Amino acid sequence: MRNFPEIQNTAYDLIVIGGGINGVGTARDGALRGLKTLLIEKDDFASGTSSWSTRLIHGGLRYLEYFEFNLVRESLREREVLLHTAPHLVQPLQLTIPVYDWSSRAYWEIQAGMILYDILSFDKTLPSHRMLSPQQFQQLFRAAEKKGLKGGAQYFDGQVEYAERLDLEVTLSAQKAGAAMLNYVAVKGLEKGENNLITAIHCQDQLSGEKFTVNSAQAIVINTTGPWVDEVCGLAHRGGEPVAIVQERKIGGTKGSHIVVDPFPGAPASALYVEAFVDKRPYFIIPWLGKYLIGTTDHRYDGSLDRVKASDDEIDYLIAETNRVMPAAQLTRQDVRFTYSGVRPLPYTDGKKAGSITRNHILYDHSQDGVNNLISLIGGKLTTYRQVGEEMVDKVYGKLRRSAPPCPTLTQPLPGAEAYPLSLETAMDKYGNHLERHSIQHLFCLYGARAGDILALVHGAPELGERIIPSLPDIKAQVVFAVQAEMAHTLVDICRRRTAIAMVTNDYGFSALAGICQTLTDHCGWTQEQCDKQIQKYHEYMEQNCIPDYCLH
Protein backbone atom coordinates (compact mmCIF):
# COMPACT_ATOMS: atom_id res chain seq x y z
CA MET A 1 0.00 0.00 0.00
CA ARG A 2 2.80 2.46 0.92
CA ASN A 3 5.35 1.26 -1.65
CA PHE A 4 7.40 4.43 -2.13
CA PRO A 5 10.03 2.96 -4.51
CA GLU A 6 7.22 1.84 -6.82
CA ILE A 7 5.56 5.26 -6.60
CA GLN A 8 8.90 6.90 -7.32
CA ASN A 9 9.26 4.85 -10.52
CA THR A 10 5.71 5.37 -11.80
CA ALA A 11 4.78 7.90 -14.47
CA TYR A 12 1.53 9.54 -13.37
CA ASP A 13 -0.99 11.49 -15.44
CA LEU A 14 -2.61 13.16 -12.43
CA ILE A 15 -1.04 14.02 -9.08
CA VAL A 16 -3.38 15.48 -6.46
CA ILE A 17 -2.01 17.24 -3.37
CA GLY A 18 -4.54 17.34 -0.54
CA GLY A 19 -6.86 14.62 0.76
CA GLY A 20 -9.91 16.66 1.65
CA ILE A 21 -13.20 15.99 -0.09
CA ASN A 22 -12.31 17.95 -3.25
CA GLY A 23 -8.93 16.27 -3.55
CA VAL A 24 -10.21 12.73 -3.16
CA GLY A 25 -13.15 13.57 -5.44
CA THR A 26 -10.72 14.69 -8.14
CA ALA A 27 -8.57 11.56 -7.68
CA ARG A 28 -11.64 9.33 -7.89
CA ASP A 29 -12.90 10.99 -11.04
CA GLY A 30 -9.45 10.79 -12.65
CA ALA A 31 -8.92 7.13 -11.79
CA LEU A 32 -12.41 6.15 -12.95
CA ARG A 33 -11.76 7.90 -16.27
CA GLY A 34 -8.48 6.10 -16.87
CA LEU A 35 -5.81 8.49 -15.60
CA LYS A 36 -2.82 7.07 -13.71
CA THR A 37 -3.50 8.88 -10.45
CA LEU A 38 -1.62 9.62 -7.21
CA LEU A 39 -2.95 11.54 -4.21
CA ILE A 40 -0.73 12.84 -1.41
CA GLU A 41 -2.08 14.09 1.94
CA LYS A 42 0.23 15.36 4.70
CA ASP A 43 -2.10 14.31 7.53
CA ASP A 44 -5.12 12.00 7.40
CA PHE A 45 -7.89 12.06 4.82
CA ALA A 46 -10.50 14.69 5.82
CA SER A 47 -8.28 16.00 8.60
CA GLY A 48 -8.77 19.64 7.56
CA THR A 49 -11.77 21.68 6.45
CA SER A 50 -13.74 18.61 5.29
CA SER A 51 -13.92 17.41 8.88
CA TRP A 52 -14.91 20.72 10.46
CA SER A 53 -18.11 21.61 8.59
CA THR A 54 -21.74 21.82 9.77
CA ARG A 55 -22.22 18.40 8.10
CA LEU A 56 -24.87 19.60 5.69
CA ILE A 57 -25.34 18.61 2.07
CA HIS A 58 -27.23 21.71 1.08
CA GLY A 59 -28.03 24.10 -1.70
CA GLY A 60 -26.90 27.15 0.21
CA LEU A 61 -30.13 29.03 0.82
CA ARG A 62 -28.15 32.02 2.08
CA TYR A 63 -26.29 32.39 -1.24
CA LEU A 64 -29.54 33.50 -2.91
CA GLU A 65 -29.08 36.86 -1.18
CA TYR A 66 -25.88 37.36 -3.13
CA PHE A 67 -27.52 36.29 -6.41
CA GLU A 68 -25.29 33.21 -6.71
CA PHE A 69 -28.05 31.31 -8.48
CA ASN A 70 -25.67 29.09 -10.45
CA LEU A 71 -23.95 27.98 -7.24
CA VAL A 72 -27.29 27.23 -5.56
CA ARG A 73 -28.56 25.29 -8.57
CA GLU A 74 -25.31 23.30 -8.81
CA SER A 75 -25.40 22.57 -5.07
CA LEU A 76 -29.04 21.45 -5.16
CA ARG A 77 -28.31 19.11 -8.06
CA GLU A 78 -25.30 17.64 -6.22
CA ARG A 79 -27.42 17.24 -3.09
CA GLU A 80 -29.76 15.03 -5.11
CA VAL A 81 -26.81 13.04 -6.51
CA LEU A 82 -25.49 12.31 -3.02
CA LEU A 83 -28.89 11.29 -1.68
CA HIS A 84 -28.84 8.57 -4.35
CA THR A 85 -25.14 7.59 -4.49
CA ALA A 86 -24.50 7.59 -0.72
CA PRO A 87 -27.91 7.02 0.93
CA HIS A 88 -26.33 5.35 3.99
CA LEU A 89 -24.36 8.53 4.75
CA VAL A 90 -26.54 11.34 3.38
CA GLN A 91 -30.06 11.63 4.78
CA PRO A 92 -32.86 14.19 4.30
CA LEU A 93 -32.91 16.83 7.03
CA GLN A 94 -35.90 19.01 7.87
CA LEU A 95 -34.98 22.58 8.80
CA THR A 96 -37.16 25.38 10.11
CA ILE A 97 -36.42 29.10 9.97
CA PRO A 98 -38.10 31.20 12.68
CA VAL A 99 -38.95 34.76 11.64
CA TYR A 100 -39.14 37.50 14.30
CA ASP A 101 -39.97 41.18 14.12
CA TRP A 102 -36.28 41.92 14.73
CA SER A 103 -35.12 39.62 11.91
CA SER A 104 -33.27 41.36 9.08
CA ARG A 105 -35.29 39.34 6.56
CA ALA A 106 -39.07 39.82 6.61
CA TYR A 107 -41.53 36.91 6.43
CA TRP A 108 -42.31 37.65 2.77
CA GLU A 109 -38.59 37.75 1.91
CA ILE A 110 -38.08 34.33 3.46
CA GLN A 111 -41.12 33.06 1.54
CA ALA A 112 -39.73 34.45 -1.73
CA GLY A 113 -36.40 32.77 -1.02
CA MET A 114 -38.16 29.47 -0.34
CA ILE A 115 -40.08 29.64 -3.61
CA LEU A 116 -36.88 30.36 -5.52
CA TYR A 117 -35.09 27.52 -3.69
CA ASP A 118 -37.86 25.13 -4.80
CA ILE A 119 -37.68 26.39 -8.39
CA LEU A 120 -33.90 25.87 -8.49
CA SER A 121 -34.37 22.32 -7.14
CA PHE A 122 -37.06 21.43 -9.69
CA ASP A 123 -35.70 17.88 -10.06
CA LYS A 124 -35.58 17.10 -6.34
CA THR A 125 -37.06 14.10 -4.52
CA LEU A 126 -37.30 15.99 -1.21
CA PRO A 127 -40.56 17.74 -0.20
CA SER A 128 -41.09 21.40 -1.09
CA HIS A 129 -41.16 24.12 1.54
CA ARG A 130 -44.14 25.19 3.62
CA MET A 131 -44.69 28.45 5.45
CA LEU A 132 -45.78 28.41 9.10
CA SER A 133 -48.00 30.83 10.96
CA PRO A 134 -46.87 31.85 14.46
CA GLN A 135 -49.37 29.35 15.90
CA GLN A 136 -48.10 26.51 13.70
CA PHE A 137 -44.50 27.33 14.58
CA GLN A 138 -45.28 27.35 18.31
CA GLN A 139 -47.02 23.98 18.07
CA LEU A 140 -43.84 22.47 16.60
CA PHE A 141 -41.35 24.36 18.79
CA ARG A 142 -43.11 25.03 22.08
CA ALA A 143 -39.93 26.11 23.88
CA ALA A 144 -38.86 28.64 21.24
CA GLU A 145 -38.95 32.37 21.99
CA LYS A 146 -42.49 33.64 21.34
CA LYS A 147 -41.96 37.38 21.67
CA GLY A 148 -42.02 39.05 18.26
CA LEU A 149 -42.59 35.77 16.40
CA LYS A 150 -43.96 36.33 12.89
CA GLY A 151 -43.99 32.69 11.77
CA GLY A 152 -41.52 30.41 10.06
CA ALA A 153 -40.49 28.48 6.98
CA GLN A 154 -39.88 24.75 6.81
CA TYR A 155 -37.85 23.01 4.11
CA PHE A 156 -35.53 20.05 3.50
CA ASP A 157 -31.83 19.73 2.77
CA GLY A 158 -29.36 16.88 3.34
CA GLN A 159 -27.27 15.92 6.36
CA VAL A 160 -24.08 13.85 6.43
CA GLU A 161 -23.59 13.01 10.10
CA TYR A 162 -20.26 11.33 9.39
CA ALA A 163 -18.70 13.81 6.94
CA GLU A 164 -15.28 12.22 7.46
CA ARG A 165 -16.60 8.88 6.27
CA LEU A 166 -17.97 10.47 3.09
CA ASP A 167 -14.42 11.62 2.35
CA LEU A 168 -13.12 8.14 3.20
CA GLU A 169 -15.59 6.33 0.94
CA VAL A 170 -14.62 8.57 -1.97
CA THR A 171 -10.98 7.74 -1.12
CA LEU A 172 -11.67 3.99 -1.11
CA SER A 173 -13.57 4.28 -4.39
CA ALA A 174 -10.58 6.07 -5.96
CA GLN A 175 -8.24 3.40 -4.63
CA LYS A 176 -10.46 0.64 -6.00
CA ALA A 177 -10.32 2.36 -9.41
CA GLY A 178 -6.51 2.21 -9.34
CA ALA A 179 -5.44 5.48 -7.71
CA ALA A 180 -2.58 5.43 -5.20
CA MET A 181 -4.02 7.22 -2.16
CA LEU A 182 -1.40 8.20 0.45
CA ASN A 183 -2.15 9.80 3.79
CA TYR A 184 0.64 10.99 6.10
CA VAL A 185 2.90 11.98 3.21
CA ALA A 186 3.99 15.63 3.21
CA VAL A 187 5.08 17.58 0.16
CA LYS A 188 8.40 19.21 1.00
CA GLY A 189 9.21 20.82 -2.32
CA LEU A 190 8.03 21.40 -5.89
CA GLU A 191 10.86 21.32 -8.43
CA LYS A 192 10.25 23.85 -11.20
CA GLY A 193 12.11 22.98 -14.39
CA GLU A 194 13.33 25.28 -17.15
CA ASN A 195 10.36 24.16 -19.26
CA ASN A 196 7.79 25.90 -17.03
CA LEU A 197 6.69 22.60 -15.51
CA ILE A 198 6.69 21.17 -12.02
CA THR A 199 9.07 18.32 -12.90
CA ALA A 200 9.36 16.65 -9.48
CA ILE A 201 7.60 16.61 -6.12
CA HIS A 202 9.77 15.95 -3.08
CA CYS A 203 7.89 14.07 -0.35
CA GLN A 204 8.42 12.70 3.13
CA ASP A 205 6.51 9.92 4.84
CA GLN A 206 5.30 11.39 8.15
CA LEU A 207 5.18 7.94 9.76
CA SER A 208 8.66 6.58 8.97
CA GLY A 209 10.55 9.71 7.95
CA GLU A 210 11.39 8.14 4.58
CA LYS A 211 11.98 10.65 1.79
CA PHE A 212 11.17 10.07 -1.87
CA THR A 213 10.58 12.01 -5.08
CA VAL A 214 7.68 11.71 -7.50
CA ASN A 215 8.29 12.43 -11.18
CA SER A 216 5.67 14.95 -12.28
CA ALA A 217 7.08 16.12 -15.63
CA GLN A 218 4.40 14.22 -17.58
CA ALA A 219 1.62 14.86 -15.05
CA ILE A 220 -0.86 17.58 -14.26
CA VAL A 221 -0.51 18.56 -10.58
CA ILE A 222 -3.69 19.58 -8.76
CA ASN A 223 -3.43 21.62 -5.56
CA THR A 224 -6.58 20.90 -3.53
CA THR A 225 -5.11 21.73 -0.13
CA GLY A 226 -7.89 24.14 0.85
CA PRO A 227 -6.58 26.80 3.25
CA TRP A 228 -3.02 25.57 2.56
CA VAL A 229 -3.13 26.41 -1.19
CA ASP A 230 -0.79 29.40 -0.88
CA GLU A 231 1.54 27.47 1.41
CA VAL A 232 1.92 24.65 -1.14
CA CYS A 233 2.50 27.14 -3.96
CA GLY A 234 5.27 28.58 -1.79
CA LEU A 235 7.19 25.26 -1.84
CA ALA A 236 8.45 25.74 -5.41
CA HIS A 237 12.18 25.94 -6.08
CA ARG A 238 14.60 25.69 -8.98
CA GLY A 239 18.08 24.31 -8.40
CA GLY A 240 17.68 24.68 -4.65
CA GLU A 241 16.62 28.34 -4.84
CA PRO A 242 13.04 29.37 -3.93
CA VAL A 243 10.87 30.40 -6.87
CA ALA A 244 7.62 32.32 -6.46
CA ILE A 245 4.71 30.69 -8.29
CA VAL A 246 2.12 33.28 -7.33
CA GLN A 247 2.75 36.94 -6.61
CA GLU A 248 -0.55 37.52 -4.82
CA ARG A 249 -2.35 35.67 -2.08
CA LYS A 250 -5.13 33.40 -3.38
CA ILE A 251 -6.84 32.23 -0.17
CA GLY A 252 -8.53 34.48 2.37
CA GLY A 253 -9.75 31.95 4.90
CA THR A 254 -12.62 32.52 7.27
CA LYS A 255 -12.99 30.56 10.47
CA GLY A 256 -16.13 28.65 11.41
CA SER A 257 -16.60 27.14 14.87
CA HIS A 258 -19.13 24.69 16.32
CA ILE A 259 -20.08 23.41 19.75
CA VAL A 260 -21.65 20.07 20.68
CA VAL A 261 -24.04 19.86 23.64
CA ASP A 262 -26.31 17.23 25.18
CA PRO A 263 -30.09 17.52 24.67
CA PHE A 264 -31.26 20.51 26.72
CA PRO A 265 -34.64 21.65 28.11
CA GLY A 266 -36.83 22.55 25.16
CA ALA A 267 -34.36 21.18 22.60
CA PRO A 268 -36.00 21.11 19.15
CA ALA A 269 -36.98 17.74 17.67
CA SER A 270 -35.75 18.90 14.26
CA ALA A 271 -33.14 21.36 13.03
CA LEU A 272 -33.47 25.13 13.34
CA TYR A 273 -31.83 27.66 11.03
CA VAL A 274 -31.72 30.85 13.06
CA GLU A 275 -30.58 34.40 12.49
CA ALA A 276 -28.28 35.51 15.30
CA PHE A 277 -29.52 38.56 17.19
CA VAL A 278 -26.08 40.13 17.71
CA ASP A 279 -24.63 40.09 14.20
CA LYS A 280 -27.56 38.84 12.04
CA ARG A 281 -25.50 35.86 10.82
CA PRO A 282 -27.51 32.65 10.25
CA TYR A 283 -26.49 29.62 12.33
CA PHE A 284 -27.85 26.12 12.92
CA ILE A 285 -29.12 24.11 15.90
CA ILE A 286 -29.10 20.52 14.63
CA PRO A 287 -29.90 17.17 16.29
CA TRP A 288 -26.76 15.10 15.68
CA LEU A 289 -25.85 11.61 16.94
CA GLY A 290 -27.97 11.97 20.07
CA LYS A 291 -26.57 15.43 20.78
CA TYR A 292 -26.94 18.92 19.31
CA LEU A 293 -24.50 20.52 16.90
CA ILE A 294 -24.61 24.32 17.07
CA GLY A 295 -22.79 26.62 14.65
CA THR A 296 -21.21 28.18 12.84
CA THR A 297 -19.31 31.45 13.21
CA ASP A 298 -17.68 33.34 10.34
CA HIS A 299 -14.55 35.42 10.99
CA ARG A 300 -11.50 36.21 8.91
CA TYR A 301 -8.60 34.02 9.99
CA ASP A 302 -4.84 34.40 9.59
CA GLY A 303 -3.62 32.13 12.40
CA SER A 304 -2.05 28.67 12.32
CA LEU A 305 -3.86 26.37 9.89
CA ASP A 306 -2.70 23.26 11.75
CA ARG A 307 -4.11 24.35 15.11
CA VAL A 308 -7.55 25.88 14.67
CA LYS A 309 -9.77 26.09 17.72
CA ALA A 310 -13.08 27.62 18.76
CA SER A 311 -12.27 30.63 20.91
CA ASP A 312 -13.96 31.24 24.26
CA ASP A 313 -15.72 34.26 22.69
CA GLU A 314 -17.10 32.13 19.84
CA ILE A 315 -18.35 29.51 22.30
CA ASP A 316 -20.02 32.20 24.42
CA TYR A 317 -21.61 33.69 21.28
CA LEU A 318 -23.14 30.35 20.22
CA ILE A 319 -24.37 29.65 23.76
CA ALA A 320 -25.93 33.12 24.12
CA GLU A 321 -27.67 32.99 20.74
CA THR A 322 -29.07 29.52 21.43
CA ASN A 323 -30.37 30.66 24.83
CA ARG A 324 -31.96 33.68 23.14
CA VAL A 325 -34.05 31.59 20.73
CA MET A 326 -34.53 28.72 23.23
CA PRO A 327 -34.87 30.46 26.62
CA ALA A 328 -35.48 27.24 28.57
CA ALA A 329 -32.12 25.84 27.44
CA GLN A 330 -30.10 27.97 29.87
CA LEU A 331 -26.88 26.61 28.39
CA THR A 332 -23.57 27.50 30.03
CA ARG A 333 -19.93 26.78 29.24
CA GLN A 334 -20.19 23.65 31.40
CA ASP A 335 -22.72 22.16 28.95
CA VAL A 336 -20.26 22.17 26.04
CA ARG A 337 -19.12 18.58 25.39
CA PHE A 338 -16.98 19.12 22.31
CA THR A 339 -15.92 21.94 20.02
CA TYR A 340 -14.39 22.08 16.60
CA SER A 341 -13.31 24.78 14.22
CA GLY A 342 -12.10 24.95 10.63
CA VAL A 343 -11.03 27.40 7.97
CA ARG A 344 -13.06 27.92 4.80
CA PRO A 345 -10.68 28.18 1.81
CA LEU A 346 -12.40 31.20 0.26
CA PRO A 347 -10.92 33.51 -2.39
CA TYR A 348 -8.85 36.32 -0.91
CA THR A 349 -10.71 39.63 -1.01
CA ASP A 350 -9.63 42.78 0.76
CA GLY A 351 -12.15 44.44 3.03
CA LYS A 352 -15.23 42.37 2.17
CA LYS A 353 -17.49 41.16 4.98
CA ALA A 354 -16.70 37.48 5.68
CA GLY A 355 -20.24 36.27 5.03
CA SER A 356 -20.47 38.01 1.65
CA ILE A 357 -17.35 36.44 0.09
CA THR A 358 -18.34 34.18 -2.80
CA ARG A 359 -18.68 30.45 -2.14
CA ASN A 360 -18.19 29.70 -5.85
CA HIS A 361 -15.10 27.63 -6.57
CA ILE A 362 -12.32 28.72 -8.91
CA LEU A 363 -10.04 26.38 -10.88
CA TYR A 364 -6.93 28.54 -11.03
CA ASP A 365 -4.58 27.54 -13.86
CA HIS A 366 -1.02 28.59 -12.98
CA SER A 367 0.04 28.72 -16.63
CA GLN A 368 -0.63 32.45 -16.27
CA ASP A 369 2.09 32.40 -13.58
CA GLY A 370 4.54 30.50 -15.77
CA VAL A 371 3.76 26.99 -14.50
CA ASN A 372 1.94 24.99 -17.15
CA ASN A 373 1.07 21.81 -15.25
CA LEU A 374 -0.31 23.15 -11.98
CA ILE A 375 -3.95 23.96 -11.13
CA SER A 376 -5.10 25.16 -7.70
CA LEU A 377 -8.63 24.92 -6.37
CA ILE A 378 -9.78 28.09 -4.63
CA GLY A 379 -12.95 27.55 -2.63
CA GLY A 380 -15.03 24.41 -2.97
CA LYS A 381 -17.77 23.03 -0.73
CA LEU A 382 -18.51 19.62 0.73
CA THR A 383 -21.74 19.39 -1.27
CA THR A 384 -20.22 20.11 -4.68
CA TYR A 385 -17.06 17.97 -4.46
CA ARG A 386 -18.19 15.64 -7.27
CA GLN A 387 -18.80 18.53 -9.66
CA VAL A 388 -15.37 19.98 -8.80
CA GLY A 389 -13.75 16.60 -9.52
CA GLU A 390 -15.48 16.36 -12.89
CA GLU A 391 -14.44 19.90 -13.87
CA MET A 392 -10.86 19.30 -12.74
CA VAL A 393 -10.47 16.07 -14.69
CA ASP A 394 -12.00 17.64 -17.81
CA LYS A 395 -9.35 20.36 -17.48
CA VAL A 396 -6.59 17.78 -16.91
CA TYR A 397 -7.54 15.92 -20.08
CA GLY A 398 -7.52 19.22 -21.97
CA LYS A 399 -4.02 20.07 -20.72
CA LEU A 400 -2.82 16.55 -21.60
CA ARG A 401 -4.31 17.09 -25.08
CA ARG A 402 -6.30 13.90 -24.77
CA SER A 403 -10.00 13.27 -25.34
CA ALA A 404 -11.85 12.98 -22.02
CA PRO A 405 -14.01 9.87 -21.52
CA PRO A 406 -17.50 10.42 -20.07
CA CYS A 407 -17.64 11.11 -16.33
CA PRO A 408 -19.32 8.18 -14.49
CA THR A 409 -19.63 9.71 -11.01
CA LEU A 410 -23.08 11.25 -11.51
CA THR A 411 -24.71 7.85 -10.97
CA GLN A 412 -21.97 5.57 -9.64
CA PRO A 413 -22.64 4.71 -5.98
CA LEU A 414 -19.97 5.01 -3.31
CA PRO A 415 -18.68 1.70 -1.86
CA GLY A 416 -21.13 1.56 1.05
CA ALA A 417 -24.06 2.01 -1.34
CA GLU A 418 -23.04 -0.72 -3.77
CA ALA A 419 -25.08 -3.91 -3.92
CA TYR A 420 -23.96 -6.35 -1.25
CA PRO A 421 -25.25 -9.85 -0.53
CA LEU A 422 -25.75 -9.08 3.17
CA SER A 423 -28.70 -6.80 3.96
CA LEU A 424 -29.53 -5.34 7.38
CA GLU A 425 -32.36 -7.85 7.80
CA THR A 426 -30.11 -10.79 6.90
CA ALA A 427 -27.41 -9.49 9.25
CA MET A 428 -29.94 -9.26 12.08
CA ASP A 429 -30.96 -12.88 11.51
CA LYS A 430 -27.39 -14.13 11.16
CA TYR A 431 -25.66 -12.15 13.92
CA GLY A 432 -28.54 -11.08 16.18
CA ASN A 433 -27.74 -13.77 18.76
CA HIS A 434 -24.06 -12.81 18.94
CA LEU A 435 -24.18 -9.04 18.54
CA GLU A 436 -26.51 -6.37 19.93
CA ARG A 437 -29.07 -5.28 17.36
CA HIS A 438 -28.30 -1.63 18.07
CA SER A 439 -24.66 -2.25 17.12
CA ILE A 440 -25.64 -4.01 13.89
CA GLN A 441 -27.90 -1.09 12.91
CA HIS A 442 -25.10 1.33 13.78
CA LEU A 443 -22.67 -0.53 11.51
CA PHE A 444 -25.04 -0.25 8.55
CA CYS A 445 -25.45 3.51 9.21
CA LEU A 446 -21.69 4.03 9.19
CA TYR A 447 -20.53 1.54 6.57
CA GLY A 448 -23.60 0.77 4.49
CA ALA A 449 -23.12 -2.46 2.56
CA ARG A 450 -19.52 -2.67 3.83
CA ALA A 451 -20.87 -3.51 7.30
CA GLY A 452 -20.72 -7.13 6.14
CA ASP A 453 -16.91 -6.94 6.13
CA ILE A 454 -16.90 -5.91 9.79
CA LEU A 455 -19.39 -8.61 10.74
CA ALA A 456 -17.07 -11.11 9.03
CA LEU A 457 -14.30 -10.01 11.41
CA VAL A 458 -16.63 -10.70 14.34
CA HIS A 459 -17.43 -14.12 12.88
CA GLY A 460 -13.71 -14.94 12.91
CA ALA A 461 -13.00 -13.43 16.34
CA PRO A 462 -16.19 -13.15 18.45
CA GLU A 463 -14.53 -10.90 21.06
CA LEU A 464 -14.43 -8.18 18.38
CA GLY A 465 -18.21 -7.96 18.69
CA GLU A 466 -17.89 -6.40 22.16
CA ARG A 467 -18.63 -2.69 22.56
CA ILE A 468 -15.60 -0.41 22.80
CA ILE A 469 -17.27 1.36 25.73
CA PRO A 470 -20.70 0.50 27.18
CA SER A 471 -22.36 3.83 26.33
CA LEU A 472 -21.77 3.61 22.55
CA PRO A 473 -22.82 1.04 19.92
CA ASP A 474 -19.35 1.00 18.31
CA ILE A 475 -17.62 -2.40 18.52
CA LYS A 476 -13.98 -3.48 18.66
CA ALA A 477 -14.08 -4.86 15.11
CA GLN A 478 -14.36 -1.28 13.84
CA VAL A 479 -10.94 -0.51 15.32
CA VAL A 480 -9.35 -3.46 13.51
CA PHE A 481 -11.20 -2.62 10.30
CA ALA A 482 -10.05 1.01 10.45
CA VAL A 483 -6.41 -0.07 10.54
CA GLN A 484 -6.60 -3.03 8.16
CA ALA A 485 -8.99 -1.66 5.52
CA GLU A 486 -9.31 2.11 5.98
CA MET A 487 -5.72 3.38 6.29
CA ALA A 488 -6.03 4.56 9.91
CA HIS A 489 -2.61 5.02 11.52
CA THR A 490 -3.33 6.94 14.75
CA LEU A 491 -5.80 7.01 17.62
CA VAL A 492 -7.08 10.36 16.31
CA ASP A 493 -7.78 8.69 12.95
CA ILE A 494 -9.78 5.96 14.68
CA CYS A 495 -11.70 8.04 17.25
CA ARG A 496 -12.18 11.29 15.36
CA ARG A 497 -12.52 10.28 11.69
CA ARG A 498 -13.24 6.54 11.24
CA THR A 499 -15.74 6.70 14.12
CA ALA A 500 -17.26 9.60 16.07
CA ILE A 501 -16.13 8.28 19.47
CA ALA A 502 -14.14 11.44 20.24
CA MET A 503 -17.15 13.67 19.69
CA VAL A 504 -19.96 11.83 21.46
CA THR A 505 -18.45 10.37 24.65
CA ASN A 506 -18.55 13.59 26.73
CA ASP A 507 -14.86 13.13 27.64
CA TYR A 508 -13.30 13.60 24.18
CA GLY A 509 -12.93 9.84 23.84
CA PHE A 510 -10.33 9.53 26.61
CA SER A 511 -12.27 6.74 28.36
CA ALA A 512 -12.12 4.61 25.20
CA LEU A 513 -8.37 4.82 24.57
CA ALA A 514 -7.17 2.01 26.86
CA GLY A 515 -9.63 -0.50 25.40
CA ILE A 516 -8.85 0.56 21.84
CA CYS A 517 -5.13 0.19 22.47
CA GLN A 518 -5.70 -3.31 23.86
CA THR A 519 -7.55 -4.25 20.66
CA LEU A 520 -4.75 -2.75 18.55
CA THR A 521 -2.16 -4.71 20.53
CA ASP A 522 -4.09 -7.99 20.27
CA HIS A 523 -5.13 -7.76 16.62
CA CYS A 524 -3.02 -5.16 14.78
CA GLY A 525 0.48 -5.68 16.16
CA TRP A 526 0.77 -2.38 18.03
CA THR A 527 3.40 -2.27 20.78
CA GLN A 528 2.89 -0.81 24.24
CA GLU A 529 5.38 1.93 23.36
CA GLN A 530 3.36 2.77 20.26
CA CYS A 531 0.15 2.89 22.31
CA ASP A 532 1.67 5.16 24.96
CA LYS A 533 2.98 7.54 22.30
CA GLN A 534 -0.37 7.61 20.50
CA ILE A 535 -2.30 8.29 23.72
CA GLN A 536 -0.03 11.26 24.41
CA LYS A 537 -0.50 12.58 20.86
CA TYR A 538 -4.26 12.12 21.17
CA HIS A 539 -4.36 14.26 24.32
CA GLU A 540 -2.25 16.93 22.60
CA TYR A 541 -4.57 16.96 19.59
CA MET A 542 -7.68 17.41 21.73
CA GLU A 543 -6.08 20.20 23.77
CA GLN A 544 -4.92 22.03 20.64
CA ASN A 545 -8.14 21.69 18.63
CA CYS A 546 -11.20 20.64 20.63
CA ILE A 547 -11.06 21.29 24.40
CA PRO A 548 -12.08 24.89 25.18
CA ASP A 549 -9.32 27.10 26.53
CA TYR A 550 -11.39 27.86 29.64
CA CYS A 551 -11.20 24.14 30.54
CA LEU A 552 -7.41 24.11 30.31
CA HIS A 553 -6.64 27.07 32.57
UniProtKB/Swiss-Prot annotation:
Keywords for the protein's UniProt record, in alphabetical order: Cytoplasm, FAD, Flavoprotein, Glycerol metabolism, Oxidoreductase
Task: Identify the cofactor(s).
Answer: FAD
Hey, what's the signal peptide range on this chain?
Answer: none
UniProt-listed GO biological process terms: glycerol metabolic process; glycerol-3-phosphate catabolic process
Enzyme class at the top of the EC tree: oxidoreductase
Q: Where in the cell is it found?
A: Cytoplasm
Question: EC annotation?
Answer: 1.1.5.3
Q: Which residues bind FAD?
A: 13-41
What is the recorded name of this protein? Glycerol-3-phosphate dehydrogenase
